[in-house]
Amino acid sequence: MTEVVGFWESVSDDESEDKDCMEVQNTVSADESPLVQSLVSFVGSCSINLLLPFLNGMMLGFGELFAHELCWRFNWFNHRNKGYKVYPESRKIAALKEISSPGTRGRVASKFL
């Protein structure tokens, strides 16, 4: 006799008995206690929730560094882009004071701006 499993599948009695035996084998063994199983489940959950985001962040960070290095080496964007020149405000203010002081007379403090 056959039993209908799905829309297109049918399983004979022998195959269904084999499935039942396999299900019994996959159930809890007498050697493992529920505490051990719950501990293993908890560790697996923690590894997914804590380890994978860390690895994702590492890949994103190294990808950003790699992309920046490629852009710099192949000059895909102009090196004189002001986005590459990041200086502290104190250095900018000191450069502006140096330009406006009367002792400079034509000296340019462009390396700070």
UniProtKB/Swiss-Prot annotation:
One of its GO terms (cellular component) is MIM complex. It comes from Saccharomyces cerevisiae (strain ATCC 204508 / S288c). InterPro entries: OMP_MIM1/TOM13_mt (IPR013262). Keywords: Membrane, Mitochondrion, Mitochondrion outer membrane, Protein transport, Transmembrane, Transmembrane helix, Transport. The keyword Magnesium does not apply. This is Mitochondrial import protein 1. The keyword Membrane applies. Its main location: mitochondrion. It is found in: Mitochondrion outer membrane. One of its GO terms (biological process) is protein insertion into mitochondrial outer membrane. Component of the MIM complex required for mitochondrial outer membrane protein import. The MIM complex cooperates with the receptor TOM70 in binding of precursor proteins and promotes their insertion and assembly into the outer membrane. Involved in import of the subset of proteins with multiple alpha-helical transmembrane segments, including UGO1. Required for the assembly of the TOM (translocase of outer membrane) receptor complex, which is responsible for the recognition and translocation of cytosolically synthesized mitochondrial preproteins. Belongs to the MIM1 family. Component of the MIM complex containing at least MIM1 and MIM2. Interacts with MIM2; interaction is direct. Interacts with TOM70. The chain crosses the membrane at residues 39-62. Pfam families: TOM13. It comes from the Eukaryota. Disruption phenotype: Leads to reduced levels of TOM complex but retains the respiratory chain.
